[in-house]
Amino acid sequence: MQKFLNVSLWLLSGGLLFAQVPDISFDSVVPFLRLLPANIHLGEAAGVATNSKGDIFVYTRTGEEATMGGSRFFTHGGSRLLEFDPTGKYMQEMGAGIYGFMFAQTVRIDSEDNIWTVDRGADVVIKFNPTGRFLMTLGRKPEAVNPAGSGGGRGGRGVPGQGVAGDNFNRPTDVAWDAAGNIFVSDAYTNARIVKLDKLGKFIKTWGSKGSGQGQFDMPNSIAVDAQGNVYVADLGNKRIEVFDNDGNFKTQFGDVGSPWAICISPGAHQYLYSSNSNPPDSMDNGEIYRMELDGKILGKFGTAGKLAKEFGTVNEIDCRTPNVLYAGELTNWRVQKLTLHP
Amino acid sequence: MQRHREINLSVAVLLAIPMFGQDLTPAALAARAKAQNVPDIAYESVPNLLKLPTNVYLGEGIGVATNSKGHVFVYTRSQRTRLFEFDQRGTYIREIGEGLYGFVFAHAVRVDPQDNIWAVDEGANMVIEFNSEGRVVMTLGRRPEPSDAVAAPPPAGPAANPGKYTFDRPTDVGWDAAGNIFVSDGYGNSRVVKYDKNGRFLTSVGSKGSAPGQFNLPHTMAVDAKGNVYVGDRSNRRIQVFDDDLTSKAIYDTVGAPWAVCVSSGPHQYLFSSNSYPDGNDSTMSTVTGEIYKMELDGTILGRFGKAGKQLGEFSGVHEIDCRNPDEIYVSEIQLWRVQKIMLHPKGK
């Protein structure tokens, strides 16, 4: 009963707040990314991130190939990682043909400019050094396509919804780090949990399970960690952002920003939290991005769903290294927009 | 009214000459167009049309379209689905969209008045607009995400409530003068969807069936200068005409199964429709299918040309027609992996 009351209060307050949220004016240049070679095209631009030099990394879906091996069905390829200079000019491809690029989900850059890809098809998180050389994997690519009804981890291992106590992912979505370099992975679609590992990739703990209670998740689609080490989880299906301390203890939740597909916390002395209420791919509803204080206070919003410049087609990742210059990777519009905010 | 009398007349002719259908199987009898004694239009096929580089092959010639410069675009099924551009002399220029996420199983290619190139992919469930430089500028629909489990395929058949922005094996695309976009959708959803020029849903028509306004495989589509939409309702063996708001206007059902329709440009527009030799390669069909009809927009049949076969000038499952110039037709074929350019010589020219 208490839970229902809380939900009603969120809805009520959300409805009231929605009407009061100021619009933030902004600009966008489309197309921003340019001079791609004739044989390289963006597909669904699932991931976008910048490094400290302002270079832009795009992790995009390009289409997998399948082969039959005896009674098993193997898939290969399907994603590309591309680097652009700060003006949007194509520089190079990284990781071409690598074993773990199957179905791009996100790309993030850590404080040392290492590049991390999260692949929802290969169930692997890959760490590259700043020049694109391979450093480390988390998780393992399934040897072949899983049979139906498998359990929580890769190849059906573990408890459905909770997985195993280790880096054995089933459709992970995002990666983030605290100041000490500890790694957090949202393991989202089949499991519904957050996995914490140390900076060398050694398993520390896991929390969460599928559900709508505090500390539970229904598609944790995006995560971010603030300077204090608090972990913000975009709990997409439950239409809320849950906040945990560095050990995974529930702290609070924000429930009035729609369905958070992509969240980002800007660096610097005053950190902001961005969250995209992305339109589902089969609709043009919603689409606005919220700018918030870390305590959940909404400062403003901008954008709407659509296919033109300054409109969004299912934003799947936001980069906010510079808080008033965002990059948004879109699934259905196959592009990245550079957004300059004028708050 | 005039047209109805003609239809009755052709039925009478059919009954009066029973010899004509004597050796035909029931399937072949059904495949034959009702319209009979249609005048033949003289034509020839241009030999050695497309010049391909070594190790580039056409597969099933699923789509063909020309732009305002006469360049020829061919959308073909190969190891991967591929889109090629040739100049007006058939010289190979380039491949467009190599390795594209939305190229899975080709169905149609069309070029709009601004020379943007639109590919309709029935495997990716997408319609993809390229600018004339060959870069993607807009997409409609969405490629399904890969399944985790081969043992659990998605349920067959149409979705109970097809989404505004998702397709199920779409087949064709067209535009009215205002730039509104029409998509025939298709094998799964049996409907036509209208979007504004920016891809925002406006309206749709159709469900599976044989009543007016229903479809049994809307396989091909063309839009005239007034915004009327001609839908090749293939398995119902009729062309359905709708106004720009997708209200049903007329039905033309005497030209066989419309595998491919095209409306030519210019002040006097013509409607072409191919009663194609079916892709089942049933030889009994070959004597009663394969011809292409030339019509006025009101459905009056002006003539026909072609027959099923593999020789130059014969047609092996025409899948798309380009008729930018109504006397220079391009056709792409399924069974024989090629594109032909057909020079028509209608009487009085």
Regions found by a protein language model. Give the residues of each.
Chain A
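Eukaryotic scaffold repeat domains enriched in small/polar residues
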Residues: 20-343
